[in-house]
Swiss-Prot record:
The keyword Phosphoprotein does not apply. Disulfide bonds: none annotated. GO terms for cellular component: cytosolic large ribosomal subunit. The lineage of its organism: Bacteria, Pseudomonadati, Pseudomonadota, Gammaproteobacteria, Alteromonadales. The keyword Ribonucleoprotein applies. Residues 1-20 are annotated as: Disordered. Belongs to the bacterial ribosomal protein bL28 family. This is Large ribosomal subunit protein bL28. Pfam families: Ribosomal_L28. Keywords: Ribonucleoprotein, Ribosomal protein. Gene3D superfamilies: Ribosomal protein L28/L24. It comes from the Bacteria.
Amino acid sequence: MSQVCQVTGKRPVVGNNRSHARNATRRRFLPNLQSHRFWVESEKRWVKLRISTKGMRIIDKNGIDTVLADLRGRGVKV
């Protein structure tokens, strides 16, 4: 399963672990993704999204209908 937020588009970024001796080893910083079901009252159905916690805050602020319309406008199947 890909580590990409469906709402914000957040994806893993790469960086370094740093030891006390400042040795660098490559690592991935993963987004805080959650699988969450939202009830869409206008469609009378549940929609399951894989979104970051920032995406959940966006849905809380703008509403699920607005976010779904934006996703469908970008061609995301929901």
